[in-house]
From Swiss-Prot:
Free-text function comment from the UniProt entry: Core subunit of the mitochondrial membrane respiratory chain NADH dehydrogenase (Complex I) that is believed to belong to the minimal assembly required for catalysis. Complex I functions in the transfer of electrons from NADH to the respiratory chain. The immediate electron acceptor for the enzyme is believed to be ubiquinone.
InterPro entries cross-referenced by the UniProt entry: ComplexI_Subunit6, NADH_UbQ/plastoQ_OxRdtase_su6, Nuo/plastoQ_OxRdtase_6_NuoJ
Name the record gives this protein: NADH-ubiquinone oxidoreductase chain 6
Gene3D superfamilies: NADH-ubiquinone/plastoquinone oxidoreductase chain 6, subunit NuoJ
Membrane protein topology class: Multi-pass membrane protein
Alphabetical UniProt keywords: Electron transport, Membrane, Mitochondrion, NAD, Respiratory chain, Translocase, Transmembrane, Transmembrane helix, Transport, Ubiquinone
Source taxon at top rank: Eukaryota
Length: 173
């Protein structure tokens, strides 16, 4: 289990590295998907399954809108790949900042805490995941509807902008 958590943490950091170097929006979205899958997998392995699923669905919806908008604005005929020297320099700088942060923050001291799952306290522990489910269905349903409507509206606006000036409501005057 420890190796699996370490693997998910490494995938999360590598996804952040892929987004931070961001040679092109085509490759940046791969880093976003990798980071979101690793983060939600980490929550899932800790026992927070419903919140992990909701975060994954909302985050993928947001990433879809950002990806469509970025690709529409950056139509490069020759996009940079991750093997270019500038992108490798960004990656080395990101890893350097990460190493300095671990040295200053005391990386070795973090191993003393360990990983605690949701149900590790005992039989009568309250799972925060199912408490969150009750809040989603009672008080949070209106907010989820507003957030879903906003994502759908943003997607249609971006698709209208991508379509061009020839047809649609947005025209050159």
């Amino acid at each position: 289990m420890t190796y699996f958590m370490f693997f998910l943490g490494l995938c999360f950091v590598l996804g952040g590295l892929a987004v931070a170097s961001n040679p092109s929006p085509y490759y940046g979205v791969v880093g976003l998907v990798l980071a979101s899958v690793a983060g939600c997998g980490w929550l899932l392995s800790l026992g927070i399954s419903f919140v992990s699923l909701v975060l994954f669905m909302v985050y993928l919806g947001g990433m879809l809108v950002v990806f469509v908008y970025s690709v529409s604005l950056a139509a490069d005929p020759f996009p940079e790949a991750w093997g270019d020297w500038r992108v490798i320099g960004y990656g080395a700088g990101f890893v350097g900042v990460l190493m300095v942060g671990m040295v200053i923050g005391g990386f070795v001291e973090c191993w003393d805490f360990g990983v605690v799952t949701v149900d590790s306290v005992g039989m009568f522990s309250v799972r925060l995941d199912f408490g969150g489910v009750a809040m989603f269905y009672s008080c949070g349903v209106g907010m989820f509807l507003v957030a879903g409507w906003g994502l759908l509206l943003t997607l249609f606006v971006v698709l209208e902008l991508v379509r061009g000036l020839t047809r649609g409501a947005i025209r050159a005057v």
